[in-house]
Amino acid sequence: MTSGRAPHATVLLLVGAVVASACGNGSATPIAIESPRQATAAATPSATPPPTPTPTPKPRFWPLTGLSAPADASLTRRPLNVRLPNDPNARPQYGLNKADLVFDLIVEGGVTRFAAIFHSKDADVVGPVRSYRFSDLHITEMLRGGLVSSGSTVQEHDAVTASINAGKMLSVDADRDARPYYRLASRPAPNNLFTGTPADREAVNRAGGGGPVDVPALSFLLPGADPSSGGLAGAVPATKIGVPFLGVWASSFSWDGTAKGYRRSQNGAQTVDGDGSGPILAKNVIVMTTDIFQTAVIEDNLGSKGLDYRMTGGGAASVFRDGLRIDGTWKRDGALDMFKFFDPSGTEILLEPGQSWIHFIYPTWNVTSTP
């Protein structure tokens, strides 16, 4: 049987001594002598490198809601500011539950309208859509957004055009691109113009605004954080809130302890989304005082003059979250900065992740609340 070991080399050496042979022939007989076996060093096993740890993905949050964003979400897509009416025959509005923010703003004659901001979610049906005001210019510039509306006065149109030309915002209002808009036969004009944010985004792309933008962020508690943290100096219980707009535009909010948010009502009726998704739930209700002044622009056929707002600098603010009221201040340094809120100690108030409703009122008005 053949051995599995490698054969060893042999060396033939001639021995100098003459060995007597029984044959007596005197010749030297070569003797085969095996050479010493070479020791083979044992192989040293190579060290196994430790496994490379999988990096933990950095948490991502939507800038206008503070809610977690999936890995493939585009946090830098352009927000949309959709202008919605708030008069009784325009209700219920469609798409409100999909908005990240809703600004409730006084326009001419004490009427209020909504600036509904869509960023983290899209809504297939939004409306009715109405005309914009100077306040929409400030909000849309702040968000680097796209303005969605039915049109405006000549003066407001010119102001928005100047902002577009300066690269501060975009507008896809119906006067500039009618393709995202349609009329509902079931509703009387002018509250029958509707749109959808997917179609609005296509219009934004056509206008050259499909690239990334730096969306300013509100300041939020981290998801799951203790609600008692985040700037609550001087906080008092507040389960009912009254926003002092005039007449049928006055609104109220009631704390829903089960849903952990505020339910909005107007004229005694709960505010619901017309798309059937249910009542509004605001995680934060914010009321800011500022200078609101009349312009020379005629906004309607009654001769009502439009309003404009001071939205930079600062002023008094009341922030409602988690069933509490914090009276403090608001601050906004420049036209591209987001609003910040501070409690009486100077600590920044952090908002609850979710939808926020923001209101501006005159300095002489007061927001009411009950424990």
Where are these regions (language model features)?
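A surface/extracellular/periplasmic glyco- and lipid-processing/surface-interacting theme
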Residues: 31-34, 45-46, 56-101, 108-371
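Bacterial N-terminal signal peptides that target proteins for export
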Residues: 1-11
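Intrinsic disorder/low-complexity segments enriched in small, polar and charged residues
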Residues: 52-54
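C-terminal motif of bacterial Sec signal peptides marking the signal peptidase cleavage site
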Residues: 19-22
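Short, low-complexity, disordered segments immediately C-terminal to signal peptides
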Residues: 24-48
